């Protein structure tokens, strides 16, 4: 099955290709985006007929380089600084000895994401759920007092420091409290692509956060079903869903498999005559 991220990128490419297929602008002249003939997916009417007007205005403003006003105060555009997704919830570790940290370019780039970052705590929690989690746990281990809880850390921006108990943060089940760019469906791993940014150092990076969330897999299935339905593709999605039992062993259990398929597929059983 095509990775979901690739599928979304292809859809975006169709949108940009349709917009760029119009007459080429004269050299030195910047044209305004014409949104009247843009099609995203095969359908009988332009996308304008079904897209809310504020979204069209935001797309045109972004393309034409004018000042952009966010439609919402939180979510992927501007995350709520006081809420964190359970996807990056801190998990206490026990009995693990600190290991030497591998100081390579990847670690130094991640370190630049933290330096004087006003959203330092969010970036730190996200990095602690990536493939370099053990390095960051070892790095933070030297900054706790002997009698301090292992879940307490300090963030410092411009020499002003704050204390945080990672076990008592305001966590929410809303995935899009973070800067989510997409989903990476690559069996046997299901990951969320998260954008990390430091406005102070102008550093940014996209990291993969592995997840074993059943609701995430269910949401991915529903999204694929919707996209394939718009494209009129004849795909046995139920069969694909059942194959996930073997392709995502970290996500599925027998009871979970029954739970996720029940709401999409209800087999009709015939009663046997006595």
Curated annotation (Swiss-Prot):
Q: Which residues form the gL betaherpesvirus-type domain?
A: 51-251
Q: Which InterPro entries match?
A: Cytomegalo_gL
Q: Which GO terms describe its biological process?
A: fusion of virus membrane with host plasma membrane; symbiont entry into host cell
Name a GO CC annotation attached to this entry: membrane
* Cystine connections: 156-161
* Organism per entry: Murid herpesvirus 1 (strain K181)
UniProt-recorded name of the protein: Envelope glycoprotein L
A Pfam family found in this protein is: Cytomega_gL
Q: Kindly list the places in or outside the cell where this protein is found, as annotated in its UniProt entry.
A: Virion membrane; Host cell membrane; Host Golgi apparatus, Host trans-Golgi network
Q: What is its main location?
A: virion
Residue span of the signal peptide, if any? Answer: 1-21
Name the source's superkingdom: Viruses
The job of this chain, per UniProt, is described as: The heterodimer glycoprotein H-glycoprotein L is required for the fusion of viral and plasma membranes leading to virus entry into the host cell. Acts as a functional inhibitor of gH and maintains gH in an inhibited form. Upon binding to host integrins, gL dissociates from gH leading to activation of the viral fusion glycoproteins gB and gH.
Report the sequence similarity comment from the record: Belongs to the herpesviridae glycoprotein L (gL) family. Betaherpesvirinae gL subfamily.
Q: How does it assemble?
A: Interacts with glycoprotein H (gH); this interaction is necessary for the correct processing and cell surface expression of gH.
State the annotated membrane topology for this chain. Peripheral membrane protein
Q: Which UniProt keywords apply?
A: Disulfide bond, Fusion of virus membrane with host cell membrane, Fusion of virus membrane with host membrane, Glycoprotein, Host cell membrane, Host Golgi apparatus, Host membrane, Membrane, Signal, Viral envelope protein, Viral penetration into host cytoplasm, Virion, Virus entry into host cell
């Amino acid at each position: 099955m095509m990775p979901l991220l690739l599928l979304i990128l292809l859809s975006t490419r169709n949108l940009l290709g349709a917009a760029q297929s119009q007459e080429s602008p004269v050299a030195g002249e910047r044209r305004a985006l014409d949104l009247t003939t843009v099609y995203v997916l095969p359908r009988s009417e332009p996308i304008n007929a079904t897209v809310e007007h504020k979204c069209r205005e935001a797309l045109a403003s972004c393309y034409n380089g004018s000042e952009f006003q966010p439609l919402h105060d939180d979510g992927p555009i501007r995350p709520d600084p006081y809420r964190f997704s359970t996807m990056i919830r801190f998990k206490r570790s026990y009995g693990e000895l600190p290991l030497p940290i591998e100081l390579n370019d990847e670690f130094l780039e991640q370190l630049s994401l933290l330096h004087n970052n006003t959203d330092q705590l969010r970036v730190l929690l996200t990095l602690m759920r990536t493939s370099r989690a053990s390095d960051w746990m070892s790095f933070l281990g030297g900054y706790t007092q002997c009698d301090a809880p292992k879940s307490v850390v300090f963030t410092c921006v411009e020499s002003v420091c704050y204390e945080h108990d990672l076990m008592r943060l305001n966590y929410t089940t809303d995935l899009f409290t973070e800067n989510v760019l997409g989903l990476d469906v690559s069996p046997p791993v299901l990951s969320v692509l998260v954008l990390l940014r430091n406005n102070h150092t102008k550093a940014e990076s996209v990291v993969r956060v592995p997840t074993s969330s059943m609701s995430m897999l269910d949401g991915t299935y529903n999204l694929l079903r919707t996209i394939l339905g718009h494209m009129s593709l004849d795909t046995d999605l139920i069969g694909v869903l059942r194959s996930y039992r073997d392709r995502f062993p970290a996500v599925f259990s027998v009871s979970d498999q029954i739970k996720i398929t029940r709401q999409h597929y209800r087999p009709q059983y015939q009663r046997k005559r006595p």
